[in-house]
């Protein structure tokens, strides 16, 4: 068996299958490596075995060696423990970002290099370019599928060793390629949601690790209107799962989460989807990371996303002395959520990002006792 020049992360899905197929057409020695990042907990919801069988089948069709690595221990310590700690603190984390940084482009990369590979390839919808002596992370050609948001924590050494073979493809084109190439995954549905939860109920899953703690649901005036099983089960702007029945003297309209008081275990709701209590024009972030290793300037204009697939929002970025980032948006943003990722763009280029720490949304600012100043950026 020849030493592979490139190891492809084969997930058992159509995207990684076509990524492997494209590389196979180039004639370089390649191999597939399947990562198991979550141990089967006996619930019957883990699809890892089905995905592994599909990955083996794809490797067989393409005539490339198949390898397997179990990274469930690394995932637990590097991703899942952080996930639980963030929810316990009342924040809403983004485990996919951390998984890419800590597992897929760290432990997987190490495993590929141990096999003798020079580079790795994955089925992400993103692109890499080398300009001005630096590696740049670019959006995928299919804007609806673009995954640069989840890859913004990657650095120069990782990008230098990474290929994104399907980054220039539209999803419809990719499906056609998979079908015409006879890949067994050509009609397989895309995976959705958090990988370790699968099709399970999120609240039931989280309740295994964070016991329910009943508290009050209040309106913005502080009137008690219902009970909740735990503030950590909810995120800002959420409508589903509140289970608020008819409230005397209130319209029969949906309720939305507008604030969480973690210390008092109180959830605040409003019937206005676009409540002023959910609006913010400023945010403070932490753990900033720049793809090229440094920000473009101490203060600069760009666009931002505070959640995946959000339209680009024009903003001004102010890099603080401690490396944290403050952002001023040109227009108010709805339900900007602490714990989620702020990702910054200059056109098609992903500059980097950070973790949202606080905003100037009125109720959240009051509950957090924030000293955040909207006078920092003029």
Swiss-Prot record:
Protein localization: Cytoplasm
The keyword Iron belongs to this UniProt entry's keyword annotation: no
Site (Interaction with tRNA): 124, 340
Short name of any one Pfam family annotated for the protein: tRNA_Me_trans_M
Region (Interaction with tRNA): 145-147, 307-308
Main location as per UniProt: cytoplasm
GO biological process terms, semicolon-separated: tRNA wobble position uridine thiolation
Keywords per UniProt: ATP-binding, Cytoplasm, Disulfide bond, Nucleotide-binding, RNA-binding, Transferase, tRNA processing, tRNA-binding
CDD domains: MnmA_TRMU-like (cd01998)
A GO cellular component annotation in the UniProt record: cytoplasm
Keyword Secreted in record: no
Binding residue positions for ATP: 9-16, 35, 123
Function: Catalyzes the 2-thiolation of uridine at the wobble position (U34) of tRNA, leading to the formation of s(2)U34.
Protein name in the entry: tRNA-specific 2-thiouridylase MnmA
Origin species: Xanthomonas oryzae pv. oryzae (strain MAFF 311018)
């Amino acid at each position: 068996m020849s030493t592979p020049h490139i190891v492809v992360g084969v997930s058992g899905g159509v995207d990684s299958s076509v990524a492997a197929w494209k590389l196979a057409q180039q004639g370089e020695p390649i191999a597939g490596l399947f990562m198991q990042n979550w141990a089967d907990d006996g619930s019957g919801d883990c699809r890892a075995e089905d995905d592994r069988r599909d990955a083996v089948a794809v490797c067989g069709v393409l005539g490339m060696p198949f390898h397997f690595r179990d990274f469930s221990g690394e995932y637990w310590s590097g991703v899942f423990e952080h996930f639980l700690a963030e929810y316990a603190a009342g924040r809403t984390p983004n485990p996919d970002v951390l998984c890419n940084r800590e597992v897929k482009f760290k432990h997987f990369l190490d495993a590929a290099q141990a096999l003798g590979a020079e580079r790795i390839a994955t089925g992400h919808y993103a692109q890499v370019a080398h300009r001005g002596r630096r590696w740049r992370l670019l959006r995928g050609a299919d804007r609806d599928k673009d995954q640069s948001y989840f890859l913004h924590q990657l650095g120069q050494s990782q990008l230098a060793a990474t290929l994104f073979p399907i980054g220039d493809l539209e999803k419809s084109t990719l499906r056609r390629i998979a079908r015409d190439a006879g890949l067994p995954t050509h009609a397989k549905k895309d995976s959705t949601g958090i990988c370790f939860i699968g099709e399970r109920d999120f609240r039931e899953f989280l309740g295994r690790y964070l016991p329910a703690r009943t508290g009050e649901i209040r309106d913005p005036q502080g009137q008690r209107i219902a009970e909740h099983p735990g503030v950590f089960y909810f995120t800002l702007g959420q409508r589903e799962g509140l289970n608020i029945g008819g409230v005397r003297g209130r319209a029969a309209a949906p309720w939305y989460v507008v604030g969480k008081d973690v210390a008092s275990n109180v959830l605040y709701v409003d019937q206005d989807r676009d409540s002023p209590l959910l609006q913010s024009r400023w945010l403070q972030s932490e753990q900033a990371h720049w793809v090229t290793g440094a920000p473009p300037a101490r203060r600069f204009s760009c666009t931002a996303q505070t959640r995946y697939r959000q339209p680009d929002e024009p903003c001004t970025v102010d890099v603080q002395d401690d490396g944290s980032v403050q952002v001023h948006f040109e227009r108010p943003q709805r339900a900007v959520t602490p714990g989620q990722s702020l990702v910054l763009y200059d056109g098609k280029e992903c500059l980097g990002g950070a973790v949202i720490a606080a905003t100037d949304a009125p109720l959240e600012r009051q509950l957090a006792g924030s000293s955040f100043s909207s006078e920092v950026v003029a």
